[in-house]
Amino acid sequence: RKTPEQHVDDIRTVVLEAAKRKIDVNIYLEDWSNGIKHSPDYVFLVIDALKGLPIRRFMLPDTLGVLNPGNTYEYCKMMVDRYPDLRFDFHAHNDYDLAVANVYSAIRAGIKGIHTTVNGLGERAGNAPLSSVLAVIKDQLGEETSLREEKINKASRLVETYSGVHIPPNKPIIGEHVFTRSEE
């Protein structure tokens, strides 16, 4: 069993070797959501030790999908405020059907990068769906992205075809019935 300092030394060695080889490095803090909830001092120890290294992005995953919009905002804001010069990405899992809401909270907290998947495909209950996140960024947060919205539906249908995972007709943004309505 290694000490936290030994883990940091291992990471430092790999990051510096990658830099020598001109390889860009991102750090994925596996199970960050549980770490920041139950062992924030450990999370801070790791980031404090690595923050001066040539790391492009620190990935903050909700690996088990345990966060909600309230604590997503709280924990992401904590990271952004404590480390204003670092670039953080948020990676949501959808175990409680909160991935998109958690992404919304992460962006409001100052997170600059968001991980999504087409149609929300991913392990267990999936990840934040690109189509929904794009709509939230534009319509709820009033922000623009460089994504070409007109291509989303085609990409979603292509992924549906090749993955064999069908898009529910009532799926927000991309479901075939989402823009229909019935009146009494």
Per-region residue spans from a language model:
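C-terminal helical cap(s) of enzyme catalytic domains, especially alpha/beta-barrels
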Residues: 122-149
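Short glycine/serine/threonine-rich phosphate/pyrophosphate-binding segments
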Residues: 96-101
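A mid-to-C-terminal "edge-of-domain" accessory segment
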Residues: 142-184
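Alpha/beta enzyme core
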Residues: 1-88, 103-111
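Gly/Ser/Thr-rich beta-alpha loop segments that engage phosphate groups in nucleotides
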Residues: 67, 122-124, 128, 166, ...
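Glycine-rich phosphate-binding active-site loops on the catalytic face of alpha/beta enzymes
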Residues: 109-126
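Generic beta-strand/beta-sheet core signal
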Residues: 28-30, 61, 89-93, 114-119, ...
